[in-house]
Amino acid sequence: MTTELFSQLRNATAASHRRLDAEIDVCGEGLTLDRYGSLLMRFHGIFSTLEPQLAAVRGLDELDFDLDLARCCRTGWLSEDLEVLGMSSRGILGIDESLHPHLVTAVPEALGCLYVIEGAGLGGQVIVPCVQRQLGLTAVHGCRFFAGHGLATGARWRRLGATADQYARRTNTHARIEQSAVDLFQTFLRWFSEDAHGNGIERRAVVGRAVQH
């Protein structure tokens, strides 16, 4: 069941969501290891700064949605996947951070971010079979980031939806939550459509390339 808040956020971010899906296009034909690695590096550049911020937001851990934000899971999963693609630990530490970091300091803004992040987790369940078919990677080997929380993904999404909706009603912060979700989509779009070094994302290769099966 979709909550009133999440319906509002879905409508507000629909256009950006479609643009980002088209930009990433993981399930499109012709996905290569180089391009897949470049996409993972881009995700790492955002999550490596965003997840610690979310974990540090005061009051967020008091909400009853049990998302275990302190573990910064997605950054760790991205690192695991990049290691499978042949990138060294030192190389992963040197990955560029997003040129447009999304700053999060309060609960409403954090909830807007979590809408985007946890929603992407739902999409990840569709992406894993695409990556496995084209690249031979699996949910536990090279595609850990997109596999996310696996079978628990749907329950996490519903729990977040109910909790965020209750919080927004109680604090009258619908507009702030919506703006944060919109802004984070824009952060992703900017970072995936530009390159600090002047090279297109299609041409950015991961160091190593050798995939250990």
Please annotate each region the language model reported.
Residues 1-213:
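Metal- and O2-centered redox machinery and metal/ROS homeostasis
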